[in-house]
Amino acid sequence: MAKTSMKAREAKRAQLVAKYAEKRAALKTIIASPASSDEDRWDAVLKLQALPRDSSAARQRNRCNQTGRPHGFLRKFGLSRIKLREATMRGEVPGLRKASW
């Protein structure tokens, strides 16, 4: 199990990403636009750098919904490999079963 503080930190990051998503997207379009002047582009870069570091989506970490484990996460199921195997063995994941050949 992941520490409660780590789960809380990830939840806080998710809130920050949602809060600043539109602002970040607008600044990035200004930076990427060939029509914007160098001065506008530079101002947009400075404003983007002034935003909170955790408001970037790249800083979010996928975690298991049950345990909070950061490694071995399977996005399709939202679980770590360990919890997915346990759920599969109990028959809780429809259409998924242990391989046998």
Curated annotation (Swiss-Prot):
A GO MF annotation of the entry reads: rRNA binding
Decide whether keyword Transferase is in the record: no
Q: Which Gene3D superfamilies match?
A: 1.10.287.1480
- One GO cellular component term, please give it: cytoplasm
InterPro entries from the xrefs?
Ribosomal_uS14, Ribosomal_uS14_bac/plastid, Ribosomal_uS14_CS
Q: For this UniProt record, give its keywords in alphabetical order, as a comma-separated list.
A: Ribonucleoprotein, Ribosomal protein, RNA-binding, rRNA-binding
Set out the biological process GO terms recorded for this chain's protein: translation
Note whether Ribonucleoprotein occurs among the keywords: yes
Q: What does this protein do?
A: Binds 16S rRNA, required for the assembly of 30S particles and may also be responsible for determining the conformation of the 16S rRNA at the A site.
Assembly with partners or alone = Part of the 30S ribosomal subunit. Contacts proteins S3 and S10.
The family note in this entry says: Belongs to the universal ribosomal protein uS14 family.
Instruction: Please identify the protein, giving its name as recorded.
Output: Small ribosomal subunit protein uS14
> What species was this sequence derived from?
Shewanella baltica (strain OS155 / ATCC BAA-1091)
Gene behind the chain: rpsN
